[in-house]
């Protein structure tokens, strides 16, 4: 591969625009995936959590006046996938528990589901963070931005899967009756 050391402002703007398009397309694909796999309420909750992850990660970079380059865009795209994976695990358990605990409301079901998946979520995030911290410390200057963005994203993504995506289902009035009706179609 050809290595480029310096990128002019015009090329840089084009690359940033391409990165924004890539993030938008990935968010749209995730929305469609969740809509098909679960229900529209779940897709809205997951997209809000993903926007949260992207905005917080890029916002921290902006507040710290750190450069946003292609490796950061790649990290953000990876964060979107990572966070979606966490959210899907919790949503899948919520869907199972909606059928299992038909008398409970969505807040109680979400709480049970999060508690059932919490150890998996924490262990996965912790091992990922250990790998990212070693890349950040030992990886050299070229990997610092990427690994820092990923560290932020894993922390924010884990938080949003638990505290943003799942509780949002309450505001969309998800319950076992609405889910059972949609599964009969």
Show where each model-derived region lies:
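A structural signal for conserved, well-ordered secondary-structure elements
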Residues: 1-185
